[in-house]
Amino acid sequence: MKVSLAGQTVDVKKILNEIPKRTVTAALLEGGEIVAVEEADDEHAERKLVRRHDVEGKVVFVTARPCLYCARELAEAGVAGVVYLGRGRGLGPYYLARSGVEVVEVHPDEPLGYDPVDRLDVLLTFGGNPYLTEEDVAARVYCLLTGRGFDADIAPAPENLSGRVEIMVTRGDPDEAVELLKEELPVFRIRRFLISGEFDRDELRERILEDIEPRILDPFAVRARIARAGAFSSSREAEVFIGDVLTSVGREVNLNDPRTVVTVDVLGPRVSVGVEKR
């Protein structure tokens, strides 16, 4: 993907392959080439770039949507253009545009789709952060994975499931991708889907007994969170199915005990099962 602004042509994929992916990164561009890079730590990457480098008349590439405060500093420093990963303007990009700075938003999935990817290898969940949208996180994940040699289809979860990003690794080892995401994005909850592909109740039963049952502590509860109609007709049906499987191996299911929760996510014909201790 290439975009043009402020007299420069920016090759988005090329830039992503050349910058660090540990956290939010801001790159200063001249003639479409990187001349300086700063990473976020105790302060935002864009502010570090402005403070340490001459950005006047140049283009800045950011791997997240700039906040309002960074946007003000970028505009005051005289940047000519800003390219950022994400979807939706927000206050930062809106301020830049009002200040006469060319702004281009890019996303790995243009146009962005809200349907889950065909096969869900990884589910990333986050919450409680008012400054991050599902699209922002999807863009960061794309930046990180492609920069390390993976190819992946990434989509924010449907609108009724906020704080979730779904990932299908199309090139590279999904297990390695998961470990990379856990290492580089420790603030997010990242897990492999135990079930991928077509729904199969016999296979689901085997996975429950193999992966879920040994990790459960008595007494425990069983819960089901239904994301989309399909495999089960209701959350209660999913609860009963999981409960029956566990009861068949000697686990008494107490649906009212909140201390340990077995979560069932039903996405179309795909089902994943995970354990959450509380």
UniProtKB/Swiss-Prot annotation:
Homodimer. GO terms for molecular function: hydrolase activity, acting on carbon-nitrogen (but not peptide) bonds, in cyclic amidines; identical protein binding; protein homodimerization activity; tRNA binding; zinc ion binding. It is an enzyme of class 3 (hydrolase). Residues 1-102 form the CMP/dCMP-type deaminase domain. Belongs to the cytidine and deoxycytidylate deaminase family. Gene3D superfamilies: 3.30.70.1940, Cytidine Deaminase, domain 2, THUMP superfamily. InterPro entries: CMP_dCMP_dom, Cytidine_deaminase-like, THUMP_dom. It catalyses: cytidine(8) in tRNA + H2O + H(+) = uridine(8) in tRNA + NH4(+). The active site is at residue 46. GO terms for biological process: cytidine to uridine editing; tRNA modification. Binds 1 zinc ion. The lineage of its organism: Archaea, Methanobacteriati, Methanobacteriota, Methanomada group, Methanopyri. Its EC number is 3.5.4.35. Catalyzes the deamimation of cytosine to uracil at position 8 of tRNA in 30 different tRNAs. This editing guarantees the proper folding and functionality of the tRNAs. Zn(2+) binds at residues 44, 67, 70. Disulfide bonds: none annotated. This is tRNA(cytosine(8)) deaminase. SUPFAM superfamilies: Cytidine deaminase-like, THUMP domain-like. SMART domains: THUMP. Its cofactor is Zn(2+). Residues 175-277 form the THUMP domain. Keywords: Hydrolase, Metal-binding, RNA-binding, tRNA processing, tRNA-binding, Zinc. PROSITE patterns: CYT_DCMP_DEAMINASES_2, THUMP.
